[in-house]
C-alpha cells in the first residue's frame, strides 16, 4: 500500500515547490496543507505527531463518528496503543479458539457420524403399521377441464350388444341405461354418447327425422297405404 493512501491528508509533493495540493471537502485547518511532506521510514516515525483534530477523527477521542476501520502502517509510523489491536492479530486468536472448540465438540459427541447416517432411514414400526389406503372414486385423478379426452374404443362384444339394444329401442331410459352399463362394463356417459352417435348415423343414412319405435308402427303404416290405394282407384273411375 502506498504512503499516500496511508495518510492522504499530507502533501505528496517535494519540499520547496511553489504550489501545494488542494484538498476537497476537508474539515481540518489550512495549516495542515502548508506542512512539508514527511519522508516515511523507520527513523521518521518517532518524531511524527498527529494534530489534535486528526487524532480525534481517527482515534475517536471526542468524535461520535462510527469506526471506519483505518489502519496505519506500523513500519513508517509509531505504533499507538496495545500491539494486540494490529490488523490480523484478533483473527488469528479467533481461528485458534474455533479449531480447539471444534475438536472438543467432536470428542464430546463421537457418535455424530453414525446418527447422521440414519436420518434418511425410517423406523421399522412405522413401516409395519402403515396399511394401503383405500381408493375411492372421488380420489382418482381426473382430467383437466380444458384438456381433450381420448377417443373411447369399444370391443366387438360391446358394439354387438349395443346394436341389439338400439334395434330394439333407439332411446334408453335411465333405468335401462344403468342396466346396460353394468352388463357391458361401461359408464352411463359412454352408453349415452354411443346411442347419440348411433341415432345421428341412422338419420343420415335413412334421411328421416323419426325412428320406428316398434314393429306395430310399421304394420300400421302398411295398412294405411293399402287402404289409400283402393280409395284412389274408386275416385279415378268416377271421374271417367
Curated annotation (Swiss-Prot):
A motif (Antp-type hexapeptide) lies at residues 135-140. Keywords: Developmental protein, DNA-binding, Homeobox, Nucleus, Transcription, Transcription regulation. Residues 112-136, 204-240 are annotated as: Disordered. SMART domains: HOX. It is found in: Nucleus. One of its GO terms (molecular function) is RNA polymerase II transcription regulatory region sequence-specific DNA binding. It comes from the Eukaryota. GO terms for cellular component: nucleus. Residues 204-227 have a biased composition (Basic and acidic residues). Signal peptide: none annotated. Residues 147-206 bind DNA. It holds the Pfam family Homeodomain. Belongs to the Antp homeobox family. Sequence-specific transcription factor which is part of a developmental regulatory system that provides cells with specific positional identities on the anterior-posterior axis. This is Homeobox protein Hox-D8.
Amino acid at each position: 500500500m502506498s504512503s499516500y493512501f496511508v495518510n492522504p491528508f499530507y502533501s505528496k509533493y517535494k519540499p520547496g515547490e511553489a504550489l501545494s495540493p488542494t484538498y476537497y471537502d476537508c474539515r481540518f485547518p489550512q495549516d495542515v496543507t502548508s506542512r512539508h511532506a514527511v519522508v516515511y521510514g523507520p527513523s521518521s516515525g518517532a518524531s511524527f505527531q498527529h494534530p489534535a483534530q486528526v487524532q480525534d477523527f481517527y482515534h475517536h477521542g471526542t468524535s461520535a463518528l462510527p469506526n471506519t476501520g483505518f489502519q496505519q502502517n506500523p513500519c513508517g509510523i509509531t505504533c499507538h496503543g496495545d500491539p494486540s489491536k494490529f490488523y490480523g492479530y484478533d483473527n488469528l486468536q479467533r481461528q485458534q479458539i474455533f479449531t480447539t472448540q471444534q475438536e472438543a465438540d467432536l470428542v464430546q459427541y463421537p457418535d455424530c457420524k453414525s446418527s447422521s447416517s440414519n436420518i434418511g432411514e425410517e423406523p421399522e414400526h412405522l413401516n409395519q403399521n402403515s396399511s394401503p389406503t383405500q381408493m375411492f372414486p372421488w380420489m382418482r385423478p381426473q382430467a383437466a377441464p380444458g384438456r381433450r379426452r381420448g377417443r373411447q374404443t369399444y370391443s366387438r362384444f360391446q358394439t354387438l350388444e349395443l346394436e341389439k339394444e338400439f334395434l330394439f329401442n333407439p332411446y334408453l331410459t335411465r333405468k335401462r341405461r344403468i342396466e346396460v352399463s353394468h352388463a357391458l362394463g361401461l359408464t352411463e356417459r359412454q352408453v349415452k354418447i354411443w346411442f347419440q352417435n348411433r341415432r345421428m348415423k341412422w338419420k343420415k343414412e335413412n334421411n328421416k327425422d323419426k325412428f320406428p319405435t316398434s314393429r306395430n308402427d310399421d304394420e300400421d303404416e302398411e295398412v294405411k297405404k293399402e287402404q289409400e290405394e283402393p280409395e284412389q282407384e274408386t275416385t279415378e273411375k268416377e271421374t271417367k
